[in-house]
Design a protein with these regions (language model features):
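Metalloprotease/metallohydrolase-associated module, dominated by Zn2+-dependent proteases
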Residues: 1-61, 81-122
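Hydrophobic (often cysteine-bearing) scaffold residues that line and stabilize catalytic clefts
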Residues: 63, 67, 71, 98
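Active-site recognition of the HExxH zinc-binding catalytic motif
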Residues: 68-80
Length: 122
């Protein structure tokens, strides 16, 4: 099972907290399995062992679910700390043709992969 920890996201410390969805209004009320809060620099990750919210999964499926979800939230954290949380403007072409986004991934991916490796979520 994953544990609570802290990570460095472009110089900002983010706390990762594994929480029971049933005990976390932010997740439960929004029907989220996780969230990244750029104001508190916290990632809340729902404990996939709660059948009420995640269904019946094997331990392996729970681990895969949590690692996949945590990777998603870590990407949000990197986007937030890069100043892109408010840059959700409409783009004429698909986002994959957005050179700014492609550049961002090219520049930031080594740092993101370092955090993924530290968290053992690759």
């Amino acid at each position: 099972m994953m544990e609570n920890t802290k990570i460095d996201v472009l110089g900002t410390e983010y706390a990762i907290k594994i929480v029971k969805v049933s005990e976390c209004d932010d997740l439960k009320n929004n029907k989220f399995c996780a969230l990244c809060n750029n104001l508190t620099h916290t990632i809340l990750l729902g404990d996939a062992s709660e059948e009420e919210f995640f269904g019946s999964m094997t331990e392996e499926e729970q681990e895969i679910q949590m690692k996949t979800t945590l990777r998603h939230e870590v990407i949000h954290a990197f986007l937030n700390e890069s100043g892109l949380q408010d840059s959700a403007a409409r783009i004429e072409a698909g986002w994959a043709r957005n050179e700014e986004m492609v550049d961002w991934f090219a520049i930031q991916s080594p740092k993101i992969f370092k955090v993924f490796k530290e968290l053992d979520i690759l």
